[in-house]
Regions:
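Conserved GTP-binding G-domain of TRAFAC-class P-loop NTPases and closely related GTPase folds
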Residues: 43-131
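P-loop NTPase motor core
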Residues: 1-65
Length: 131
């Protein structure tokens, strides 16, 4: 918001660069550090053909950088019908045609998993260690 009165394209180029730098910081961390980015999502499609992606500032980051492409694992949090009138909160593990999500083949058997980050980290560690 500090640059809200600034006109021109440069501020968006700066924001895009800063955003990309932030996402790439994970590559410089120790292997034992677990870094989880969370974000809001936005519908870049329409009401009939929705396409939910990571929300960004402006089109530069989403169209030129594609933030999801900088990650090996992308989970999409969803509320899905549970028992009766109850909703269950789950993570989508791979794209379903409307939501962006991705994990390596064979990491998760189910499309929806429990909303449990500790369990996800455990599964990722086991997968990467070849267990």
């Amino acid at each position: 918001m500090d640059r809200r009165t600034e006109t021109g394209f440069q501020k968006f180029a700066d924001i895009g660069g800063d955003f990309t730098d932030l996402l790439r910081v994970a590559d410089s961390l120790r292997d034992d550090v677990k870094l989880i980015f969370t974000s809001h999502s936005e519908n870049t499609g329409d009401a009939i053909n929705p396409h939910w992606t990571l929300k960004t500032v402006g089109k530069l980051v989403s169209e030129k950088v594609t933030p999801e492409g900088l990650f090996t694992y992308v989970f999409y949090a969803m509320a899905v019908p549970g028992d009766g009138d109850r909703m269950d909160y789950k993570f989508l593990t791979n794209a379903d045609g409307e939501h962006v999500a991705k994990t390596p083949m064979g990491m998760f058997e189910d499309l929806y998993i429990d909303n449990d980050l500790a369990k996800i980290i455990e599964v990722i560690d086991e997968y990467n260690e070849g267990e």
